[in-house]
UniProtKB/Swiss-Prot annotation:
Family: Belongs to the bacterial ribosomal protein bL17 family.
Assembly mode: Part of the 50S ribosomal subunit. Contacts protein L32.
Protein name: Large ribosomal subunit protein bL17
Cellular component annotations (GO), alphabetically ordered: cytosolic large ribosomal subunit
Keyword Ribosomal protein: yes
PANTHER family noted in UniProt: LARGE RIBOSOMAL SUBUNIT PROTEIN BL17M, RIBOSOMAL PROTEIN L17
Pfam families the UniProt entry points to: Ribosomal_L17
Ribonucleoprotein recorded as keyword: yes
Keyword annotations of the record: Ribonucleoprotein, Ribosomal protein
HAMAP family xrefs: Ribosomal_bL17
Annotated GO biological process: translation
Organism this protein belongs to: Erwinia tasmaniensis (strain DSM 17950 / CFBP 7177 / CIP 109463 / NCPPB 4357 / Et1/99)
Amino acid sequence: MRHRKSGRQLNRNSSHRQAMFRNMAGSLVRHEIIKTTLPKAKELRRVVEPLITLAKTDSVANRRLAFARTRDNEIVAKLFNELGPRFASRAGGYTRILKCGFRAGDNAPMAYIELVDRPEAQAEAVAE
């Protein structure tokens, strides 16, 4: 029985899941919007939101924790230099999930996951 087991398996083993969400979190931080399946978007929210909360307090220890979770210095720099200050006054809820139909081929439910309060110029050019 799977009672009280949180998180989705997504038909992957744990190392594949960890690598996938590490890559997806980096893409979301870099582009501020990505298109993926709805279950992956819902699970990605559980990875990205704590990273942004961590970035609100700039310290060497927090930067090392963020690097341990993302393994990308460019992502860590953007988190602490741009996103942390941008969301300093927001107490959680940094992402938004927008459903966008179904994928051709397997009819999987698709969704955009984006960071709220994106700059307007970037909001118009939707990256997929």
